[in-house]
Swiss-Prot record:
GO biological process: positive regulation of collagen biosynthetic process; positive regulation of glomerular mesangial cell proliferation; positive regulation of platelet-derived growth factor production; positive regulation of transforming growth factor beta1 production; regulation of proteolysis
Gene that encodes the chain: Serpinb7
Keywords of the record: Cytoplasm, Phosphoprotein, Protease inhibitor, Serine protease inhibitor
Protein name according to UniProt: Serpin B7
Family, as annotated: Belongs to the serpin family. Ov-serpin subfamily.
InterPro entries in alphabetical order: Serpin_CS, Serpin_dom, Serpin_fam, Serpin_sf, Serpin_sf_1, Serpin_sf_2
Modification Phosphoserine occurs at: 217
A molecular function GO annotation: serine-type endopeptidase inhibitor activity
PANTHER family tied to this protein: SERINE PROTEASE INHIBITOR, SERPIN, SERPIN B7
Disulfide bridge partners, by residue number: none
Claim: Phosphoprotein is one of the keywords in the record: yes
Length: 380
């Protein structure tokens, strides 16, 4: 799975840096895998420069384990199919769903093989709609579909004025995750603390606290601590807490560096005194500007787009790409769990390392080597 993991990570970190720089010092949260999937869906029908721009942005030319650096897009698509099949199947330990839809004006006729590939490879919805004559009803139906696909958790991806009757093709993408910590925090241990951030100077936050064994690494360059918080079901959140500011970490984000920072040989199981703020981030991004900044210009340009492998009926291009994601981090993860042996703390603890996230930090949520989410908490 190395090539998909690497391509998804490199694309996600490129996108994170672009989104972070364009929105100032705010919180950031998105699913790179989800947006990666949406763009791969477009790649199925892209031709010429359109296809080459997508390949470059998605790092489809990353060398494989065999050292072959030629375009390995078909292999990546097969890997992605397997990952998405696992994600969208039901799991008793967590809820995770990705919903991706391609909606085009009804004058365009989707190619049958494109619909089959989109549905079979990515479980995506492909549908002809009436933007021209009934844009509000179309918006309502798309929002309702996303709401159903995410079990009612994500609503109104498309706002009241987000679509116009001149829309040609719209990609809508939403992702929802609900997990339970393996080692839940205790609510009575939550403290009120000040969060040190220029974004919200002096803000008092609910700081969760627990002391037990965690996987932790201390990185010298860039200087930071990396803490692993495990969810049930093989998913982990890795929190990157800098000694000083985040700039150096952000500039060094790469798949290889993340693998190094979270390497099992480097992360030692040790007693850690953890302080982590509760936080909730809900983001609804219109991705066009961000993706253009990564070199994906042609798919959004009526005069340049070549998406002839998707549909016939005229020159097709992407009018809008919407992405919505939501996360809430609390004591239980997201819902209370019964006590297990993981929640039993020894009475006599050895000296602990302190991990105090009372300043801005980065985090990724991943399963195995696949990054599901990337985020930045500037102000909880």
């Amino acid at each position: 799975m190395a090539s998909l993991a690497a391509a998804n990570a490199e694309f996600g970190f490129d996108l994170f840096r672009e989104m972070d720089s364009s929105q100032g010092n705010g919180n950031v949260f998105f699913s790179s895998l989800s947006i990666f999937t949406a763009l791969t869906l477009i790649r199925l029908g892209a031709r010429g420069d359109c296809a080459r721009q997508i390949d470059k942005a998605l790092h489809f030319n990353i060398p494989s384990r065999q050292g072959n650096s030629s375009n390995n897009q078909p292999g990546l698509q097969y890997q992605l199919k397997r990952v998405l099949a696992d994600i969208n199947s039901s799991h008793k330990d967590y809820e995770l769903s990705i919903a991706t839809g391609v909606f085009a004006e009804k004058v365009y006729d989707f190619h049958k093989n494109y619909i089959e590939c989109a549905e079979n490879l990515y479980n995506a919805k492909v549908e002809r709609v009436d933007f021209t004559n009934d844009v509000q009803d179309t918006r309502f139906k798309i929002n309702k579909w996303i709401e159903n696909e995410t079990h009612g958790k994500i609503k109104k991806v498309l706002g009241d004025s987000s679509l116009s009757s001149s829309a040609v093709m719209v990609l809508v993408n939403a992702v929802y995750f609900k997990g339970k910590w393996k080692s839940a925090f205790t609510k009575t241990d939550t403290l009120s603390c000040r969060f040190r951030s220029p974004t919200c100077p002096g803000k008092v936050v609910n700081m969760m606290h627990q002391e037990r064994r965690f996987n932790l690494s201390t990185i010298q360059q860039p200087p930071m601590q990396v803490l692993e918080l495990q969810y049930h079901g093989g998913i982990s959140m890795y929190i990157m807490l800098p000694e000083d500011g985040l700039c150096e970490i952000e500039s060094k984000l790469s798949f290889q560096n993340l693998m190094d920072w979270t390497n099992r040989r480097k992360m030692k199981s040790q007693y850690v005194n953890v302080f982590l703020p509760q936080f909730k981030i809900e983001k609804n991004y219109e991705m066009t500007h961000h993706l253009k900044s990564l070199g994906l210009k042609d798919i959004f340009d009526e005069s340049s787009a070549d998406l002839s492998g998707i549909a016939s009926g005229g020159r097709l291009y992407v009018s809008k790409l919407m992405h919505k994601s939501f996360i809430e981090v609390s004591e239980e993860g997201t819902e209370a769990t019964a006590a297990t042996e993981n929640n039993i703390v020894e009475k006599q603890l050895p000296e602990s390392t302190v991990f105090r996230a009372d300043r801005p930090f980065l985090f990724v949520i991943k399963k195995n080597d696949i990054i599901l989410f990337t985020g930045k908490v500037s102000c909880p």
